[in-house]
Every structure is written in C-alpha cells, then in structure tokens.
Amino acid sequence: MQEIEKLRILQTEREALKNRNRVIEHEKKTEDHTESVCPECKSRQLVHDYERAELVCQNCGLVIDDDFIDRGPEWRAFDHDQRMKRSRVGAPMTFTIHDKGLSTMIDWRNRDSYGRAISSKNRAQLYRLRKWQRRIRVSNATERNLAFALSELDRMASALGLPRNVRETAAVVYRDAVDKNLIRGRSIEGVAAAALYAACRQCSVPRTLDEIAEVSRVSRKEIGRTYRFISRELGLKLLPTSPIDYVPRFCSGLTLKGEVQSRAVEILRQAAERELTSGRGPTGVAAAAIYISSILGGERRTQREVAEVAGVTEVTIRNRYKELAEKLDIEIIL
C-alpha cells in the first residue's frame, strides 16, 4: 500500500510539472510577442542591456524600454564553487531533454539526503521505486520517441563539436516535426539527422551532408531527402550556405593566421559580387579561396592538405582556384 501511495505522489508531481511547463511556455510566448519590433524604424534587431536594464534598437539606437525586470539572481558569485553553493535552483529548462529537464529522478547511489547509506532493508523498496519512477518519466510512445531521438541528436552534435544553441535549435525542429506527425513512415535517426542539418544552417554553423552522414546511422541520400521534406512542411526559411561561413573552421583546421583568414573572406566577397560563387559548391569555393590566401600570405598549404580539411577533391580546388585567380586578376606565383 505504501508503494502505491508513493507512486500516486510521483504521478501527482508529474502532472504538476506538466502544468508548470504549460505556464512557462505561455509566459515565453507572451514575452516574445511584446516589444519585438522597434516602434521607430520597425527593426527586429533589439538588444537587452542587462547592466542598464534597457531594451535598445540596434539599428537606430532608440531606447524602447528602460525598466524591464532583471531575471537573474540577487546574489553575486566570483567562482564556480560560490555559484554552486549559492544557487537555489536546478538546471535551466532545455529542449534537448524529452521532459525539458523539469522532472526529477531517484539517484542510483543508495544514500539519503545527508549522505548516509540506505539500510539493506530499504534498498529493495528503493530499487522498485526507482524502476517505476523511470517508467513514469517516459509514459507514452511520443515521449519514448523524443527520449531516443534527442539522445541521438546529442550524440551526433557532440561528435561534430556543435555549440549549445545548435543543439537547442535542432531539438525544437524535431519537436515541431513530431507535433505535425512528420515522423510517420520515416526513421527516427533520419529525421534527427535532418533536424540537426537544418539547425546548423539556421545558426550559421554549417556542416555538410557528408559530415552529418558520417556521424549518423543513415545514408547521406536519406538525410537529404528527409531534410527537404521537413523544411518544406515546417516552412523553414533557410538561405543558401555562404562559402564565407566555412572559412573560420577550415583555417582553424589548417592552423592559419587571422590575416590569411581575412584575406580569404575578402576574396570570397569579391567573388560573390561578380557572381562567381553561384551554382558551385560552397566548400570547394571556400577551399580555393583559402588556398590562394595561404600562398599570398606566405603560409603556403598544399592542395592535398586543404582538400582533406575541406572534404573536397584536389581537382575541385584546382578548378575553383584557377577560376577565381583569372576572374579576380589575382597573380599567384607557385
């Protein structure tokens, strides 16, 4: 009877967390719709200055609001230990966990809140409670789908070294696909990989389909097909990937200096103005610009080295670099 009562308490807590989640989402939507456009120039480039408690338009400089609420803590901390000691809350809400991180779990260590070991008499009961609590956290097919897909997203993002904002965006894209029932008839891994590819493009952290396919469990063809489907059905507005977005990562992989990177970006801007990048793969054009820049900057890299980092062939680099050098009147002494 005691176990049944405890399970009822756990279910009640779960319902309370769901209600709290709905309230948080409602408040977030309300906040997002208020003061999202500058009344002077109609720009959406608004910046929150938390030190001055001001909402400022980045385009025209208008101070839209000068008295918004500081949602941060009232205490100050100067290192990680102080922050952990003074914090009275748990981890922030995240879309990368199926329950958004709002639920709790019974720890696997058999110790109480004071750190004392649980007696052998109560360990069997604790084991049963832990088992049922795990089942309650993932109670239906949708949550099981999310739990598996989001863990797969996190695995792929970690393998690619993607930042937190890309992971959150990918999780939101996948959740939208689940809400619109776009998963039916498609593999979870394929949709997760497509969502990650879309998030990379949305956040201007480009990764090629080949790179995504390398860390996923599905083929490049399936990822591309699924990506086109969900982007069309969800109405994702994704601009074509610019070769400039690849330059920092490729230069970092080749250990080139900032001057070489800046020169490569300038070459690509001139090429874009003359429409030399349209209809060509962005990675190949970026690799060719870096190859030219490395020669001009006195940090020569071979075509093979650049090709390995960029994931293209040496033939592609030769064709693109000759074209750029000829059209932009760049004199290269090999």
Swiss-Prot record:
Q: Which residues form a coiled coil?
A: none
- What Pfam families is this protein classified in? TFIIB, Zn_Ribbon_TF
Which UniProt key words apply to this protein?
Answer: Metal-binding, Repeat, Transcription, Transcription regulation, Zinc, Zinc-finger
What residue intervals correspond to the zinc fingers (TFIIB-type)?
34-65
Q: From its record, what is one biological process in GO terms?
A: transcription preinitiation complex assembly
Q: Which InterPro entries match?
A: Cyclin-like_dom, Cyclin-like_sf, TFIIB, TFIIB_arc, TFIIB_CS, TFIIB_cyclin, Znf_TFIIB
According to the record, where are the sequence repeats?
151-234, 245-326
Q: Which GO terms describe its cellular component?
A: transcription preinitiation complex
Q: Kindly list the GO molecular function terms attached to this UniProt entry.
A: DNA-binding transcription factor activity; TBP-class protein binding; zinc ion binding
Asked if Zinc is a keyword of the record, the answer is yes
Quote the function comment for this protein. Stabilizes TBP binding to an archaeal box-A promoter. Also responsible for recruiting RNA polymerase II to the pre-initiation complex (DNA-TBP-TFIIB).
In which family does this protein belong, per the annotation?
Answer: Belongs to the TFIIB family.
PANTHER family per record: TRANSCRIPTION INITIATION FACTOR IIB (PTHR11618:SF13), TRANSCRIPTION INITIATION FACTOR IIB-RELATED (PTHR11618)
**What HAMAP family would the database entry show?**
TF2B_arch
Protein name per the record: Transcription initiation factor IIB
